[in-house]
């Protein structure tokens, strides 16, 4: 009786302590590191963890490999978070994916079938600002950089003028300003349109002072380089935060080098403020025909559309965001320069709140207006009411500090993250099931007489995705399918090539091949590539 009592007691204690210590907030760098190390310890046969770089602030850029068997020659997907360090949700989503995929990979049914390369956060210097005493949206790493090119570094950072630990906005009453109060919600401001007889009444800028006296505010804060502007495709040279040159940063160079050396990756999924899964890339003849292409190739459009269709089936699309080109961005690099299928999503968007009789639901600053409606409905307080302050740079003007909190519009309450992660894990699971997969089908062995044997078969791509992008076949960076026939030394291949390459097989496509062989003994046939897997066949001719 006492034994049963203690069993029940300890069971209840375990339950309540588990509830007490359940994950309730976004994880910072150290908590993420601990979680990754725990995964490696829990699944030593399927998970390996390595640091590919050290950031300027001394943080490791972690790379988690999940899979078993021949890791280098099994089709793989890369999952990347944190290329924009202000996108906190994406980092947590990538980490949650790693945790679920590691558990799935340890099962016998998944053994040796697929590999995942997860980079949860490639810009930890920037994302740590979310967890700092002073919170503001930061996309740049910790590299000492003269962002305003005045010969000084970090001399004009943000200033917390109302001492609330947040950097929001300042509005300054000024007849030369170009901003007016929003007609539907005077907490927001919109740009005045002189053609509609609107006259500006406010200046609007981020919270802070002109610390260096150059007439600009907060133009040279701590850091750095925005890694999502630092990749090689359409690098925005000389733009704020883009870096001195493409892949100038330790983090971006390490990621690009590792991916270029990892030939078995067929697709890349990244979490960024962009979304080409709800708004898929479209083929444009003129863009694809340029010497330096600026649009996807025609042969790749169908894949982007079909994967988008899958995403829309799995992930609810209420008020889903869209895509706009980010020069120097990681998702763009992953297709145009790495030549893999590149999918990116922000993972969450504010649901549309319909307010009866509202004039400007799709008008200026409608996203912020919709966010305020939604946050009020959900009981989420992420707006600082405007409060008048004394500002040394505007001694004779009315200056107020307030606005939507940093990160609020892209970082949902943590209570929503599990459900968001679950639908995206479901999507990734279904996407990985579409991977290219090679097999030999319709094998025929015929006696051709005179000690000759004909072997005929089809090499079939059982997967839904092609064995490579069309762009990959053009750049010749994605490895083609290598076909090789070998036989005993006493045998001779009379017709049919002993070794050749196939550029690409579409999903469900087959290619017939045939050999005429003289003599008896063993023959072996292999066909495949690291990103599509390998098919093998052996036969003994008697």
What is the predicted role of each segment?
Residues 459-473:
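Short amphipathic, basic-aromatic surface patches that mediate peripheral association
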Residues 490-520:
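Intrinsically disordered, low-complexity Pro/Gly/Ser/Thr-rich segments with frequent PxxP/GP/PP motifs
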Residues 533-542:
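Edge beta-strands of extracellular beta-sandwich domains
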Residues 20-22:
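Boundary at the C-terminal end of the N-terminal hydrophobic targeting segment
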Residues 73-76, 88-92, 96-292:
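Active-site/substrate-binding loop(s) of hydrolase catalytic cores
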């Amino acid at each position: 009786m006492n034994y049963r009592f203690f069993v029940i007691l300890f069971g209840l204690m375990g339950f309540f302590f588990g509830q007490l210590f359940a994950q309730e907030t976004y994880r910072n760098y150290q908590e993420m590191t601990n979680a990754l190390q725990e995964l490696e310890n829990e699944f030593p046969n399927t998970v390996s963890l390595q640091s590919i770089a050290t950031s300027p602030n001394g943080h490791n850029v972690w790379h988690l490999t999940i899979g078993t068997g021949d890791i280098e020659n099994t089709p793989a997907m890369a999952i990347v978070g944190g290329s924009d360090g202000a996108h906190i949700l994406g980092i947590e989503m990538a980490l949650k994916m790693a945790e679920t995929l590691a558990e799935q990979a340890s099962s016998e049914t998944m053994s040796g079938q697929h590999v995942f390369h997860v980079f949860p956060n490639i810009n930890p210097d920037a994302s740590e600002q979310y967890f700092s005493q002073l919170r503001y949206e930061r996309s740049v790493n910790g590299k000492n950089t003269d962002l305003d090119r005045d010969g000084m570094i970090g001399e004009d950072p943000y200033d917390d003028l109302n001492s609330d630990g947040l950097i929001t906005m300042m509005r300054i009453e000024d007849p030369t300003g170009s901003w007016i109060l929003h007609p539907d919600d005077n907490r927001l401001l919109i740009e005045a349109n002189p053609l509609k007889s609107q006259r500006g009444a406010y200046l609007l800028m981020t919270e802070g002072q002109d610390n260096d006296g150059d007439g600009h505010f907060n133009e040279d804060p701590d850091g750095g380089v925005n890694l999502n502007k630092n990749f090689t495709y359409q690098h925005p040279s000389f733009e704020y935060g883009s870096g001195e040159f493409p892949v100038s940063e330790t983090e971006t160079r390490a990621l690009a080098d590792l991916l270029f050396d990892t030939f078995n990756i067929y697709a890349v999924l990244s979490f960024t403020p962009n979304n080409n899964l709800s708004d898929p890339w479209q083929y444009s003849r003129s863009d694809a025909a340029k010497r330096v292409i600026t649009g996807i190739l025609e042969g790749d459009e169908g894949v982007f559309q079909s994967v988008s269709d899958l995403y829309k089936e799995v992930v609810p699309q209420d008020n889903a965001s869209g895509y706009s080109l980010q020069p120097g961005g990681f998702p763009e690099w992953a297709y145009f320069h790495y030549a893999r299928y590149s999918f990116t999503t922000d993972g969450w968007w504010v649901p549309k709140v319909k307010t009866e009789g509202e004039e400007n639901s799709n008008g200026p600053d409608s996203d912020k207006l919709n966010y305020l409606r939604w946050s009020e409905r959900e009981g989420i307080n992420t707006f600082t009411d405007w409060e008048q302050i004394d500002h040394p740079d505007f001694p004779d003007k009315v200056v107020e500090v307030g606005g939507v909190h940093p990160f609020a519009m892209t970082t949902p309450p943590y209570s929503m993250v599990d459900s968001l992660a679950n639908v995206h894990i479901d999507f990734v699971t279904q996407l990985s099931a579409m991977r290219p997969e090679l097999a030999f089908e319709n094998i025929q062995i015929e006696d051709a007489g005179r000690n000759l044997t004909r072997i005929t078969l089809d090499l079939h791509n059982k997967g839904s995705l092609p064995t490579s992008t069309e762009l990959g076949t053009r750049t010749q960076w994605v490895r083609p399918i290598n076909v090789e026939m070998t036989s005993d030394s006493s045998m001779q291949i009379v017709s049919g090539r002993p070794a050749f390459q196939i550029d690409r097989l579409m999903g469900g496509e087959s290619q017939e091949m045939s050999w005429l062989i003289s003599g008896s003994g063993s023959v072996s046939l292999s066909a495949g590539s690291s990103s599509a897997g390998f098919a093998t066949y052996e036969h003994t001719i008697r």
